[in-house]
Design a protein with these regions (language model features):
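Positively charged n-region of N-terminal signal peptides that target proteins for export
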Residues: 1-4
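Flexible loop/hinge segments at secondary-structure junctions
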Residues: 19-333
C-alpha cells in the first residue's frame, strides 16, 4: 500500500509538472529584483504557468525577442527604429516601473558625495583620475577626499542601465555625445568592464578607489554608497522613489511609450532615472502562451506595481498605468 501511494503521488507530481506551461523571457538586469518577485508571487496565483527569466542585459533581451527565441524581452532602453524594423511583427513596449542609475564608489569611510553632470562626464572620459581632484573637492566641502587613483567600472555587456547612464551623459555634455554617444553598448574611453549590475557592483566592492554606475537596488543590496547628483534645476538630489517619481511625472510619454526620463526639469527630480519595458509581440504566435502572458501583464500592472516601492522602484503613475492597460488589450492571441 505504501509503495502504491508513493507511486500515485509521484505520478501526480509528474502530471502537474507536465501540465505546467513554461514561458521564457530574457533581458535587463535593472528590473530583475522586481521581476523575480513578480514571477514568484504569480506562480502562487496561477500554478499552471511558470515564467523563466534570464537576466542577461537589455541588449541580449532585444536580440532574443527579435529572434523570437523568447516570449518576451526586457529592456531599460527603448528599441531603436532600426531594430524595430527588423522585427518579424509589431513589437510593443510595455512600461513596468522606473528606477535610478546611481554613481557608486569604494572609498575609505565611504563618505556621502555630491557631483554635477560635467564632473561625472570627466570621470568617465578619463579626465578626472584622482579622488582629491579640485572639482570634487569644490562640490564636497568638509569631506576628506583621499589621494587615491580612480578605477572606473562600466558594463561589459549590452545594457539598459548603460543606456540610461550614457543618455544622461550625452544630454549634459556635447563632448560625450560626439565622442561616445548613446546606446546599450558604447566604446568606453576608460575603465574596466563588469557583466550585469551584479558584476559592476562586485568589482566596485573589491577595488579600492573604484567608481561606477548601477541600479539603486544593487548599490543598497551590496551596501555601497551612492552620490547625490545635481539636477537641471541646480539642486543636488538623492536617488529614491520620490525623486524618480518626479522625474517620470516631468517626462513626455508618447503613444508608443518610448521615452527618456533623464535630466528633467522638476525641482526635486533625480536626473539619472529611467523606465524599464517588457517587449512583446502584438500578435502572439502561440495562442495559449499569449493568453497566459496577457493575464500576467494585467496582474503585474494592476497588482504587481504595489511591490515596487519596497524594492526601490517607482511605480507607474495612475494616468500612465491606464494607458498601459489599454495597450495590453491590443495583444492578440
Amino acid at each position: 500500500m505504501r509503495n502504491l501511494c508513493f507511486t500515485l503521488c509521484a505520478l501526480g507530481l509528474a502530471a502537474n509538472a507536465a501540465a505546467q506551461m513554461l514561458i521564457n523571457g530574457a533581458g535587463a538586469t535593472f528590473p530583475y529584483p522586481i521581476y523575480s518577485k513578480w514571477f514568484d508571487d504569480y506562480a502562487k496565483i496561477d500554478p499552471s504557468v511558470r515564467f523563466n527569466y534570464q537576466s542577461i542585459g537589455s541588449g541580449g533581451g532585444q536580440k532574443q525577442i527579435l529572434a523570437q527565441t523568447v516570449a518576451f524581452g526586457a529592456s531599460d532602453g527603448p528599441m531603436s527604429d532600426e531594430n524595430l524594423a527588423k522585427a518579424p511583427g509589431k513589437l510593443l513596449h510595455i512600461p513596468t516601473v522606473a528606477g535610478a542609475d546611481v554613481l557608486t564608489y569604494n572609498l575609505p569611510g565611504n563618505p556621502k558625495l555630491k557631483l554635477d553632470g560635467p564632473t561625472i562626464v570627466d570621470i568617465f572620459l578619463g579626465k578626472i583620475t584622482r579622488w582629491n581632484d579640485q572639482r570634487l573637492a569644490d562640490q564636497n566641502p568638509g569631506v576628506k577626499l583621499p589621494d587615491l587613483d580612480m578605477v572606473v567600472v562600466h558594463r561589459s555587456d549590452g545594457s539598459g542601465t548603460t543606456y540610461i547612464w550614457v543618455d544622461y551623459l550625452s544630454g549634459v555634455s556635447k563632448e560625450w555625445e560626439t565622442k561616445v554617444g548613446r546606446g546599450t553598448s558604447v566604446n568606453w574611453p576608460t575603465g574596466l568592464g563588469g557583466k550585469g549590475n551584479e558584476g559592476v557592483a562586485g568589482q566596485i566592492k573589491q577595488l579600492p578607489g573604484a567608481v561606477g554606475y548601477v541600479e539603486l537596488i544593487y548599490a543598497k543590496q551590496n551596501k555601497l554608497p551612492y552620490g547625490d547628483v545635481k539636477n537641471a534645476a541646480g539642486n543636488y538630489i538623492t536617488p529614491g522613489i520620490e525623486s524618480v517619481t518626479e522625474a517620470m511625472s516631468a517626462a513626455t510619454i508618447p503613444d508608443d511609450f518610448r521615452f527618456s526620463m533623464v535630466n528633467p526639469t522638476g525641482e526635486k527630480a533625480y536626473p539619472i532615472a529611467g523606465c524599464t519595458w517588457l517587449l512583446v509581440y502584438e500578435q502572439q504566435k502561440d495562442s495559449e502562451k499569449g493568453k497566459k502572458l496577457v493575464e500576467f501583464l494585467n496582474w503585474a500592472i494592476n497588482q504587481g506595481e504595489s511591490m515596487a516601492a519596497a524594492l526601490d522602484y517607482a511605480p507607474l503613475p495612475d494616468n500612465v498605468k491606464q494607458r498601459v492597460l489599454e495597450r495590453i488589450k491590443t495583444i492578440q492571441y
